[in-house]
């Protein structure tokens, strides 16, 4: 074994990567790797999950004494010292020198070793990357190393408890880890033993290859299907085993449920190549190596695989011969062979293995399905040639954008017998696709705003529990596609009319349980000139009549289903009831809108010519916001009986709610909701000239209205599809009024609207409002009151930045702009505002509605948190109704109210106070028998008399205890036996003097210190007994053995630097608190002065024994005097007034103080 040396500083800073020991399997793995690097031929692992112990014994080269000194130190290793020998570093497992150091941080590590040819062995004990013991150990006779880990994760109780709660899982992970290592190192003997059950979990014998190990674990049948591989091509060498040519998959009809195991080709390959061809990713499992160039490596493996499989078997695929491969891999293998013949190095198979969107993946249902594991999007893109443009197809997960642009290059049918990459004989392929259509619930979907997809008819024998369906046929002609540009079909080879019977949209009506079984018919081929395409055509059922249901949860969804499914359990709606449930008496579909109306980007397909490519581009669809007969808003489409006058009265009031939210969404310009989608029927036309004055963006050949980019909101006239037009006023003040009326719980003539918050919930916590005057009164006046009365806004003492904002936001269109400007002028002059009066905000008579709404100023500041009576939703006033009660509070001094706060250049509240300001503090009289006021350095502060005296007594008692005056030793009547972990014995011996000084007297019986044997007898035997003879007595309180263990833990955490045990601190805090002055105790001025003088002498004068503050600064007198000096005249403000200093005034103040 090489010499252990510290890594150079340059190498150390270049790595910057640590090893995290997150479970016991990782600890075992690192120790086994060290044994393999030492050249061991036999490695024995002993594991105890409950006792949190691991022992690894090997017969390697061992460690010399000089190397043992550096062993376990961070950045000390024998495997890597310079970047120039990086080729040799790859031969070892871990070369940063951090494994043993990381293990010693979370456990007690013991290393016993004997080097080859050395007379003596050595022992080293470490904890926290620090050496606790290093000496000679002659118990080991043969060369090798024994590493023992005790008390694993002692500093991480959560991880330790989790590990001990599932010992079987931990043992299984360790067995799996060792098995993986044994496959690579078949010439080494491994054994894993559970010491708690004496059960041998895993054992291997040395062999020349891993074939015997595979035969034992995988079975004879599986091993017989493998063939040996050993091929060298230049710098690459691939050896191992892979599935032979006689492997056959199970038939798709016999696979059963999806949760059962399905057989697939297996392989175990070992790739040997120079170090410069790959890079380590350093991920925790150490199972990932990234090649710099994957192309040659993958191509080399492909050639080996194709060479082992018989050539005639592969050719049978072209003739529909034997089913050698899985159906999903058949076409891929054909393409791979064609590409390999042309000299291509990268197969389309790797492209198809990329991450596909969630909508393209099969649903995780327990359904019968075939072995076709190819992406189901191959039905949409039936071509072998894909164009990867930019980042459209990203290998990252959860990154799928509708901006993807796929060009389908159609091959010449005259030169080749295939169409879009499909075999000319497509019977077998269509059958496999038909099976997939029957078993795949999440079919290839094209859902955004309006979606169509390949779906089942109304006789398939399964229930759609999380999807809704449209059984109305959609007829699309060429002109309609050019006009609307809203339907996104990712199919090619469409005729003038495409008949799709159903539509399944992603995240549509959740919880909708359809009791109608659906079935598939044989797919029909839609023939187009020049080629053919596989597009299933499903027959229609003309007699079905659609219905429309809507639910609200993150958007609005439409569900059109057959009359055969009258029972449909809806998901949770927005307010316990649906928006509307009208009936349709025609086959025409309906388009509805939700509360949060968003315009979603959609994919529009341009069908310029069927012989050309189909491009998918991203646009923003424009909608026609119309007005119904009842004044409701909806998306404009062809006339539908659903929106006729007789049927509209049933859901009129509820639907008007959506109109207001529609106005709000249009005004705010929200970003599109990705889960918002619509369902539509045939002949849907969207008017692109809905709001001509809004900002529009030109995209392609059509103009689309980007509603989220609209900045101008004026009176718009929205054309209705009913043949008439209504004036729709989108006014920001009206929208805000509707919003505030809803949030305040008021009602209007459109019907009662429930609050989003449950009535059974407790009231909101009302935050403290610093900028509202104490004398501010919330009141309302009759609607006929004059808004220009001089006492309307007498006490609007809000801050300068917030006053105008609250006036503009709270006073809606009921208040004219002239009155707002007048209010701003009156607020700007501070002399016109009176000091204390009722605060009233008056609204004039409403013009648009009969319902009059009055809002107080506090409600505008926080409408949701306005005080309401719990369970009754009625306002409760927090101030007295009589104004004279408020005027009687003028004597209360509030430094954050009135003109004093508004005009202050500096805050009246001191930011902090230091201990030096207490030196010359002036003590005033006691307040409320609780506090001691002081004036320190121009700052008025109050001192908690209980907290201050508690701090004084605590430091006095602490000084006595540390001096040994208030503590004694109490001997126990009977010796108490202690059972400590192994680490406890070490700590008890290391810190025995400190423990004895405090009064714990222990009798430690030292037995023979023997080393660990192979059977781990030291872990199974009874720990060394320790008897406790005496305990300390602190201020008359006897401590216990539990306090001793707590002190040991503290010493271990602080490396012996702590002085006072935690139990002693608790006793001192309790005694100081019980003996201190309490609230309600009257104090003389002299006693107050003594408390302040004692507080000055303490080390922590601003904290009590429990950490709470003793002193709080109130007012900065210097800043207060500056502000009072700015007040003109002899005006009295909260009892403060500038007066001339006279003898009479001083005499009167003295008389008042005496009385």
Curated annotation (Swiss-Prot):
- How would you summarize where this protein is expressed among tissues? Expressed in reproductive tissues.
Loss of function: phenotype: Reduced fertility and meiotic defects: 60 per cent reduction in crossovers and delayed prophase I progression.
**Keyword set, alphabetical order:** DNA damage, DNA repair, Nucleus
CC annotations in GO: chromosome; mismatch repair complex; nucleus
Give the record's GO biological process terms. Answer: mismatch repair; reciprocal meiotic recombination
* Record text on subunit structure and interactions: Heterodimer of MLH1 and MLH3, called MutLbeta, which is involved in correction of a specific subset of IDLs when associated with MutSbeta.
The record's comment on protein family reads: Belongs to the DNA mismatch repair MutL/HexB family.
Could you tell me what this protein is called? DNA mismatch repair protein MLH3
| Source organism per UniProt | Arabidopsis thaliana (Mouse-ear cress)
Which gene does this sequence derive from?
A: MLH3
